[in-house]
Amino acid sequence: MLNKEEIIVPKNLEEEMKESYLRYSMSVIISRALPDARDGLKPSQRRILYAMKQLNLTPGVKHRKCAKICGDTSGDYHPHGESVIYPTLVRMAQDWAMRYPLVDGQGNFGSIDGDPAAAMRYTEARLTHSAIFLLEDLDKDTVDMVPNYDETKYEPVVFPSKFPNLLCNGSSGIAVGMATNIPPHNLGELIEATLLVLANSQTSIEDILEVMPGPDFPTGGIICGTEGIRSTYYTGRGKLRLRARMHVEENSDKQRENIILTEMPYNVNKSRLIEQIAELINEKTLTGISDVRDESDKDGIRVVLELKKGESSEVVINRLYKFTDVQVTFGANMLALDKNLPRTMNIHRMISAWIRHRMDVIQRRTRYELNKAEARAHILEGFLKALSCMDEVVKTIRESSNKEHAKQQLVELFSFSEAQALAILELRLYQLTGLEADKVQKEYSELLEKITYYRKVLAEEELVKDIIREELQELHKVHKTPRRTRIEMDAGDVRDIEDIISDESVIITISGDDYVKRMPVKVFREQKRGGQGVTGFDMKKGSDFLKAVYSASTKDYLLIFTNFGQCYWLKVWRLPEGERRAKGKPIINFLEGIRPGEQVAAVLNVKRFEQGEYLFLATKKGVVKKVSLDAFGSPRKKGIRALEIDDGDELIAARHIANDEEKVMLFTRLGMAVRFPHDKVRPMGRAARGVRGVSLKNEQDFVVSCQVVTEDQSVLVVCDNGFGKRSLVCDFRETNRGSVGVRSIVINQRNGDVLGAISVTDCDSILLMSAQGQAIRINMQDVRVMGRATQGVRLVNLREGDTLVAMEKLSINTESVETEENLAASVQSGQDTIEE
């Protein structure tokens, strides 16, 4: 049974659902999820800040309980429950969530580890200076006020917003069918960009990028590349790749490295990141990390990733980027309410929206000030008029029966307005003195000047812009802060570990105990022949000695041949980088399957494994073998067989043959040399034994060097005692493979036995290293060409008891290199051949 007042309206269910959902969607979009482009706030944030203003919680006053703030907000402006309001209040107080926090919290407001804030009954808050800038001039009719939900109070639809808060603090939210994710920016940079647009509305986005290169996140970190920034600024949408900021420190034991994370990517939970890394370590996805520690304190973030002994920090960092939140993507979508409609805006349009709003605020504020000044001037005009005939005015007032009668008499007899008459009636007697009259006249004159100025501002738009400009410049002067987020222009996608490795020439050293390291070429300064050099390897008497030195490029492939005839495949950048005096790390850490007594005998660096090119291998007893280079292009974890070694023999050299014109030279310890075309040795399989390359003079003699040469080159033969000789290749008679050969240098007490030989040109320099770690670099232009059978000249002054143990060629492309910087620039990456 229906009451008379009840009415039932039949309606199609589909239409009702469509209309209701549309109303709900618009409510979420306009009144909940999206920020306003003018003040950068959502309704819930705006209502909390307004409630705090009503409580007079300015920066200088005592904090108030958050429960009180949330209660007033819920009861007066935002009827959604305190438990919904409090998280919004908390976020506005977190300095890792907001670039410029709007709430000054006292108590536990959570942490970057994801810890929740304490209950609202325990925490307290007040407004920050940034929030005051948003609220400034709110009481001067600068924005529209609308009734609250129950029409008992009024609230602002937007704040005056003295700075572009939307771009300063950013915003995120999910509406119906759309979402926003606006990154925060640096206030100082944003003000400079705003001043550009203010001065010229046609300012290009390129000009904006000059002064505001990109977002500035509260947690710092790194933005990789500028492509995502440019896309965001031009279109309003883009993907920013964010990385944690980290550095590498040497462990206290000097044998390992630690990766130190000091800044997190935006919105990354530090505690969850540490858990993620630990899980990947347990799953063997991150194999190079032995321990993870969180050493963060009140001074800042410090997460320590302790690496295993011999692990490359570059490799581990790359895998952190690939598998963890050390690198994340921030999907920027600059969607905001512009004129009450959701719009995706580029950076220029977003700045312009704030400028339009601020101009409207300035004009409304000026109009308010003008009305106030005109009203006051009107009263002062009445005072001045009354002072000019004060006796008559006083007499009229005394003769009136009451206040209302006095007001009417003043209006009728002296032509005062009602407002002027009321003001005169409220004057105190002391204000009728001459001194007070002068003050009234002065105030009136000042008001007339202000009125003239206010009217001029309202009439000229350029003056409004000048006011905005002055306010921004004052903010810039007082509240400018350094940028926190670094932008790395050359950072790219990590698709391959080598993407983070720079391509540079390096020196690789191996000690007698098989400790290996790599060093930049520039650490060795070139000297004249006969110099004493610099310390290239720090040795203590009776301890390890330097066995070999090689040159390569960081992105080359290293084929590492052992004395047992085994070949291992390795990238140069995987080797640990050390200083000149550093000993390095055991090479066994980088090569799996090394057997007892097995040592590195030769290293070859190649950029690619081409068909038609060969490796030429030589043993200590004069056995040689030629193998196709592409046979070594498929590495195995525990190495592959390169040469079948006879008992008592061992591999001593490996050479790269690229064309048919190259010939092979073998040099022996007792000063003999043999030269023959490489086609005298047919290509063989990897497991083959090889053929005789040179016949040794006696059991004390053995092969010390194998070189691949051309006719236009010369060879430098170096002896143990620091003497050597440079001779033309053509001076060495070509012989058959397997012959004894010809004399390469005179062997005597002064020279000592032959250390090695190497092919050179005038554009080369030679690096010599001694058993005690002495190193010298010599330009081949300083070593003249001599006859084949001569004794040679002094190449290096060795300390008493010291002998040379290693030599290496470095190709350079300048005639004279005097500085470390020029020397480093002259090295031709990847073109050197390498030998012990």
From Swiss-Prot:
Pfam families xrefs: DNA_gyraseA_C, DNA_topoisoIV
Residue intervals of the Topo IIA-type catalytic domain: 34-500
Keyword match Magnesium: no
PROSITE patterns per the UniProt record, alphabetical: TOPO_IIA
Catalytic residues (UniProt): Y122 (o-(5'-phospho-dna)-tyrosine intermediate)
GO MF terms held by the record: ATP binding; DNA binding; DNA negative supercoiling activity
Broadest EC class assigned to this enzyme: isomerase
Motif (GyrA-box): 527-533
HAMAP family, A to Z: GyrA
Protein name: DNA gyrase subunit A
The organism of origin for this protein: Chlamydia trachomatis serovar D (strain ATCC VR-885 / DSM 19411 / UW-3/Cx)
